[in-house]
Amino acid sequence: MRIQKLRQDAVLPKYAHGSHEDAGMDLCAVEDATLEPGVPRLVPTGLTVEIPPGYEAQVRPRSGLALKHAITMPNAPGTIDPGYRGELRVLLLNLGREAYTVHAGDRIAQMIVARYEAVEWVEGELADSARGTGGFGSSGR
């Protein structure tokens, strides 16, 4: 998959424990960013990618940032479509009580690349199912 550094100091995504053990590659911040409590902030990575047709990338929070500092992604998972050529930026949200600073080079999210199926809708009546219209709470506790 093609990748381009928009800034020389950008860090290429990599698997922390190797591709045989990790599904997600770490994305790093390319500059410092202070995350104020409750205020979403886009953090740049300095990277752009060319995702092949039939694939997508999903950007997800890092569990360590969430556990230790209450930093998450309000739009998780973020989707990167194959046609997008802009900079990869990560929307972070500080759910903690104090400001938290992400430093250049810090791992801020995980990116997973996967195939997807494009579908075409066929309008018409739906077949019956055992579940029917049972939605939220329909399976019990």
Where are the language model's segments positioned?
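DUTPase catalytic domain/fold
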Residues: 1-141
